[in-house]
């Protein structure tokens, strides 16, 4: 669970405030991450990493050369030898520092890289459940799938058994949103695939965003942006210079530049302008 405390920066120091703007943790920290699982990463004057709770109390001393955010009760840490392992929320080392890199836990598994810089996955006991054979420093599971990269730097997906379910054939793969992920082919064109790897929207766009409320922004060959549905049909023509915010509660924010000014508009799912924002120089 994420905290309602928000990080603030004043006089070159970090602190935290609540939703009402009240300072809960004074701005006296050299560096701070966001709260995750009730703890936030901090860095002291010696550039050592530790963690505080939501009262500002240091609950894990600043003794690590690096640390990641807590996820599923564990945080990755790096020791003085440059090796990574994991601690629990008491600061106890639960997985020894023996890996070249380590990502956060997601769906019970965390990515690690071995001495050959090959990537695999371990469980919360530290056992290797997916052998180290892939490239890239980090990977995370979402909805049972994790993106992987092969020796040719092509992207695909594996499931939690390590089986390749979407072959490594793409230059880029985005996260799945509403069942579809955007992909980039060798011609630098974008389209969308489903979780079986089937191409649902052909790679024909110069840019593409995630699906939200059934629509995704796309960019045409003229650099203009519009929206498509999940079948690939253009439902809002490409006429905008930028999409500032995807659809939420039936409204998206788009922008055009005219004579050096940025003009913002709220549009509905029919593409109709229903409100205007300010103009910025």
Q: What does each model-found stretch correspond to?
A:
Residues 1-281:
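Residue-level detector of conserved, function-critical positions
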């Amino acid at each position: 669970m994420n905290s309602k405390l928000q990080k603030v920066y004043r006089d070159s120091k970090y602190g935290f405030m609540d939703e009402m703007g009240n300072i809960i943790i004074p701005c006296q920290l050299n560096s701070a991450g966001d709260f995750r699982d009730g703890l936030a990463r901090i860095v002291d004057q010696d550039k050592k990493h530790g963690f505080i709770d939501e009262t500002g109390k240091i609950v894990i001393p600043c003794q690590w050369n690096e640390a990641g955010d807590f996820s599923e009760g564990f945080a990755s840490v790096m020791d003085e030898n440059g090796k990574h392992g994991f601690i629990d929320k008491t600061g106890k080392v639960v997985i020894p520092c023996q890996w070249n890199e380590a990502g956060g836990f997601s769906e019970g598994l965390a990515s690690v890289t071995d001495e050959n810089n090959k990537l695999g996955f371990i469980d919360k006991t530290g056992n290797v459940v997916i052998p180290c054979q892939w490239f890239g420093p980090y990977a995370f599971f979402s909805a049972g799938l994790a993106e992987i990269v092969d020796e040719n730097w092509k992207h695909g997906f594996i499931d939690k058994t390590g089986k390749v379910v979407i072959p490594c054939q793409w230059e880029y793969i985005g996260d799945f949103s509403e069942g579809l992920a955007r992909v980039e082919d060798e011609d630098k064109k974008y389209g969308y695939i489903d979780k079986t790897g089937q191409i649902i929207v052909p790679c024909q766009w110069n840019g593409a965003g995630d699906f939200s409320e059934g629509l995704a922004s796309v960019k045409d060959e003229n650099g203009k942006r519009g929206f498509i549905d999940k079948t690939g049909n253009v439902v809002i023509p490409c006429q905008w210079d930028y999409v500032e915010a995807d659809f939420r509660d039936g409204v998206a924010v788009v922008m055009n530049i005219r004579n050096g000014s940025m003009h913002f508009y709220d549009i509905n799912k029919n593409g109709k302008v229903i409100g205007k924002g300010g103009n910025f120089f």
